[in-house]
Amino acid sequence: MTEKIFKINGIDICTESFGNPKNPAILLIMGATCSMVYWDEEFCEQLANTGKFVIRFDNRDVGCSVTYEPGTFNYTVTDMAEDAIGVLDAYHIDKAHLFGMSLGGMITQIAAVKHPERILTLTLLATSVIGSDNNTRDLPPMDERILTHHANGTHLDWTNKNVVAKYLVSGSRLLCGSKRTFDEKRVYNQVKQEIERANNLLSMFNHALLQGDDAYEGVLHSIQAPTLVIHGTDDTALPFEHGLALIDEIPNSVLLTLEGAGHENHPDDWEDIIHAVIEHTSKI
């Protein structure tokens, strides 16, 4: 694996790659407030060992990429999609498979709408529609416990790394599915990396200021790339119905249901996820 910082769209974006650059590329795009460390290193290596060139990167305002003062609202999800395409440019990759989780899945959808010529396939994990063809669609909201947890963060002493680590671990616990074992040691190690790597940890909350874009209403039907939707039945952040909505709106899509999984990329599911992704991406 090799970590590199590139100047992309005039800003620093931190990336890391796994595997042989000559292999077909899979770009991993993580969700809101989370850096690339939440794509577990072992997961990336397992994916690369199947014959893929795997790239993960820090979105704006997390990890070692550019950060802005907390409370700053100066970019859009579309800008983040352009960053993802810029990562492909930086690695001199003409076309790639995109794999996005949560907000990363929405970034992936926008990239597919704006740059279809760059996309081989899409994989959308624990995410939702960027814009619906169905104006009457009423998708279930995020669990109140998660919203309360986020609200409690405003009273936290963010200078105390131990307090912050405990808070972030407890947030991950809320996302774990009822039929998955929460591995506190694993999550703590991720959180520790997150805290130590961050240029400005509090800047991650700028992602909460991102707003939807009406320009993407009713455009999902235009996505032609084969799409694999992966969703847990016990997702408390974006309930299972969000995954079903994607299947309903993206023409060439299939669903992998993770029974009892939450809003997570849980190690118990890696074998099924990687098998499905390899089968999905090998068709192109």
Put a short name on every predicted segment.
Residues 105-116, 122:
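Short glycine-enriched nucleophile-adjacent loop
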Residues 11-67:
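Conserved HGGG/HGGXW glycine-rich cap/lid loop of the alpha/beta-hydrolase fold
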Residues 236-242:
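Conserved alpha/beta-hydrolase "acid-adjacent" motif
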Residues 122-157:
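Flexible "cap/lid" loop of the alpha/beta hydrolase fold
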Residues 143-218, 225, 245:
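Alpha/beta-hydrolase
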Residues 253-284:
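Catalytic active-site module of serine/aspartate enzymes centered on a nucleophile-bearing elbow/loop
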Residues 223, 229-231:
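Short beta-strand/loop motif that positions the catalytic acidic residue
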Residues 78-96:
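Conserved acidic catalytic loop of the alpha/beta-hydrolase fold
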